[in-house]
Amino acid sequence: MFTRTIRQQIRRSSALSLVRNNWTREEIQKIYDTPLIDLIFRAASIHRKFHDPKKVQQCTLLSIKTGGCTEDCKYCAQSSRYNTGVKATKLMKIDEVLEKAKIAKAKGSTRFCMGSAWRDLNGRNRTFKNILEIIKEVRSMDMEVCVTLGMLNEQQAKELKDAGLTAYNHNLDTSREYYSKIISTRTYDERLNTIDNLRKAGLKVCSGGILGLGEKKHDRVGLIHSLATMPTHPESVPFNLLVPIPGTPVGDAVKERLPIHPFLRSIATARICMPKTIIRFAAGRNTCSESEQALAFMAGANAVFTGEKMLTTPAVSWDSDSQLFYNWGLEGMQSFEYGTSTEGEDGTFTLPPKERLAPSPSL
């Protein structure tokens, strides 16, 4: 159950005062353990104070350099240590990447994310220059641009910022305690150090994790605690449902997808602890029913990845998401559109203008 203090804070405090960076692990655990129907209601109430609940950003993720990674992340298809059938490729040509970005924008995506499978950028000067050029070109399309390129130093972060990068993704993956069971080639503190370098360069941070790695609920709480107690909350927190990859240690050990209720608890808890953050329903969404996805939006998720692929795993198609949005009265979020609440100053719900109302569905 919610403690009286937390319940009173949600009901009585101004929206601004709900933003905290001093959450204790015990507080987050109590929030997580709240009966789910009450937890989602309270998360939705906070969500409406900071965001338009009908707005969901569509993002597209492209692997611009696939496979051959030297890291040993035990869930990853792109690690060279496991026999997953993924072939290593070179960096995509600039024109090929830009064509993918144009398609994504035409389909409704307003954030274009690019991932490269390697540990860090050290010794990749020519490749880094090509990536900087890609960032400049995609940004000129009036899209948000995010990349995930492994660990980086402060100077590299500044160069990315100068090129027009919106945000950098560097996930924590799981709790500090469970982390060593998943990865041994990079420490938790190295991940936090990269995030610190991003902040110093003035970049927005995208950092979240993967649920269903075999972790326990206290590990999900631990992940949220690590994110919610950062000096500045990540502007973006992606939650991934594990997609088991045959040939990886985790993929061979985990036979079933994590049930939806702990995933919803994690989204709702993160929404309460980080009310201004964009929470992204990332990998594994294709394994969820439409109703399960809608519950995630009610719990506080307000961004999805859509398109052809999630790096090496299946994504939900643009056409499927178009139907999903229609059925549930959702709208795509524009680039750089954040924090548009539909509540009045007193917390009352305000109907949107008529032109923004979705057509009445047939069912």
From Swiss-Prot:
Q: Where do the annotations place [2Fe-2S] cluster binding? A: C113, C146, C206, R280
Query: Has UniProt tagged this entry with the keyword 4Fe-4S?
Result: yes
Q: Which residues carry this modification: Phosphoserine?
A: S13, S14, S17
Fetch the PROSITE patterns from UniProt: RADICAL_SAM
Q: Write the protein's name.
A: Biotin synthase
Q: Which CDD domains match?
A: Radical_SAM
What are the residue boundaries of the Radical SAM core domain, all occurrences included? Answer: 54-276
Any one GO MF annotation of this record:
biotin synthase activity
* Catalytic reactions on record: (4R,5S)-dethiobiotin + (sulfur carrier)-SH + 2 reduced [2Fe-2S]-[ferredoxin] + 2 S-adenosyl-L-methionine = (sulfur carrier)-H + biotin + 2 5'-deoxyadenosine + 2 L-methionine + 2 oxidized [2Fe-2S]-[ferredoxin]
What is the enzyme's main class?
Answer: transferase
User: Which GO CC terms are listed, alphabetically?
Assistant: mitochondrion
What pathway or pathways are given for this protein in its record? Cofactor biosynthesis; biotin biosynthesis; biotin from 7,8-diaminononanoate: step 2/2
- Organism per entry: Schizosaccharomyces pombe (strain 972 / ATCC 24843) (Fission yeast)
Name the EC number(s).
2.8.1.6
Q: Which UniProt keywords apply?
A: 2Fe-2S, 4Fe-4S, Biotin biosynthesis, Iron, Iron-sulfur, Metal-binding, Phosphoprotein, S-adenosyl-L-methionine, Transferase
Q: Which residues cross the membrane?
A: none
Report the cofactors.
Answer: [4Fe-4S] cluster; [2Fe-2S] cluster
The protein's matches in InterPro entries, at most eight in alphabetical order, are given as: Aldolase_TIM, BATS_dom, Biotin_synth/BioAB, Biotin_synthase, Elp3/MiaA/NifB-like_rSAM, rSAM
Q: Which GO terms describe its biological process?
A: biotin biosynthetic process
**Residues holding [4Fe-4S] cluster:** C69, C73, C76
Q: Does the keyword S-adenosyl-L-methionine apply?
A: yes
* Stated role: Catalyzes the last step of biotin biosynthesis, the conversion of dethiobiotin to biotin.
Annotated stretches, region: Disordered: 337-363
Q: Which domain of life is it from?
A: Eukaryota
In the record's cofactor note, how is the cofactor described as bound?
Binds 1 [4Fe-4S] cluster. The cluster is coordinated with 3 cysteines and an exchangeable S-adenosyl-L-methionine. Binds 1 [2Fe-2S] cluster. The cluster is coordinated with 3 cysteines and 1 arginine.
- Family recorded in the similarity comment: Belongs to the radical SAM superfamily. Biotin synthase family.
